[in-house]
A protein has these predicted regions:
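Short glycine-rich phosphate-binding loop at a beta-alpha junction
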Residues: 149-158
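Feature marks short, highly hydrophobic, charge-poor N-terminal signal-anchor/signal peptide-like helices
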Residues: 1-10
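Alpha-helical membrane-embedded segments
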Residues: 12-19
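PRPP/pyrophosphate-binding module of the type I phosphoribosyltransferase fold
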Residues: 148, 185-189, 195-280
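Residue-level signal for inorganic ion chemistry
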Residues: 153, 171, 253
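Transmembrane-cytosolic junction motif
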Residues: 19-37
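Active-site-facing substrate-recognition patch
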Residues: 40, 50-54, 58-149, 188-221, ...
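Charged helix-capping and loop-helix junction motifs
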Residues: 166-172
């Protein structure tokens, strides 16, 4: 009888102990995820903030998901900011492509790093002609590593008015540098198309060209093509091919931003777990 009584008491003690341990573990985990989140928000370095968001996510803090994605964006994207990457020119070759930083769509912008949010704001201001963004573009152009006088060409916009609003001030700034030859008046607009950055469905936009290349750039051989944002790169490739028809050779592409991919929860969690394993 004593043995049975002892067994019952031991079982109850073990049961209570397990529940206390689980309760304490859950309580610790709850506190830990908030502590990690604070580190993510207020860390002194980019690495520290990424570490905080990653551990908050792994501890169960769902709010950390997109914060971690943005803080670790270079691990999810093939291209890195201010680093030359081969760009398929659509003509069977590649040319160097450089962008300043990642551009975040509005639905995830609040999750971005300070640098990403600043760049995304600059892109929008540049589109509307409120800033020339010349410092950003000049930094990116320097990373191409090209020599000689560079002819600067600008991507066509939906209409002539938007084109000059966007690029006139930038072209003026470029003209101050002897190694840059901006050709703002390199095309004639013959029609108006739907604006891409204001469209909710880019697939609905016509790919037909709404410009004709002017004679003053025909045959130019050392050209850089400038645009605000690269998303798929299809528009850039289309214009490169159009320029080639006029004997124009594009040797580099520079954009303010590279639009990021919106990742699934599974993709983000997989990378977080991979990073955690690498540390240990």
């Amino acid at each position: 009888m004593d043995d049975i009584h002892y067994l019952i008491v031991s079982t109850l003690v073990a049961y209570i102990g397990i529940h206390i341990a689980c309760w304490w573990g859950n309580r610790w985990k709850e506190r830990a995820k908030h502590a990690y989140m604070v580190i993510g928000q207020h860390g002194q370095s980019a690495e520290e903030r990424e570490w905080g968001y990653r551990n908050a996510l792994l501890a169960g803090e769902q709010k950390a998901e997109k914060f971690y994605m943005c803080s670790a964006m270079e691990k999810f994207m093939e291209e890195k900011p201010l680093t030359p990457h081969p760009f398929d020119d659509g003509l069977g070759g590649t040319i160097p492509f450089v962008f300043y930083d990642y551009y975040l769509p509005m639905k995830i912008r609040n999750y971005g790093t300070e640098g990403q949010k600043e760049l995304s704001w600059v892109v929008n201001e540049f589109k509307e002609g409120r800033v020339d963004a010349s410092g950003y573009f000049l930094t990116a152009i320097a990373k191409l590593g090209l020599s000689g006088t560079l002819t600067i060409l600008f991507m066509p916009c939906s209409n002539e008015r938007n084109y000059y609003i966007r690029f006139r001030a930038l072209a003026k700034e470029f003209s101050r540098y002897k190694e840059l030859d901006p050709e703002l008046y390199s095309m004639t607009y013959i029609s108006v198309r739907k604006s891409k950055h204001r469209s909710t469905d880019r697939k609905e936009i016509s790919v037909d060209s709404n410009i004709v290349v002017d004679a003053n750039v025909v045959g130019r051989q050392n050209c850089i093509l400038i645009d605000d944002v690269c998303t798929t790169g299809d528009s850039i490739r289309t214009h490169i091919a159009e320029l080639r028809n006029y004997g124009v050779r594009v040797v580099g592409v520079v954009c303010l931003g590279r639009t990021v991919r919106i990742l699934t929860k599974e993709q983000i969690m997989k990378q977080a777990e991979k990073d955690s394993e690498l540390i240990f």
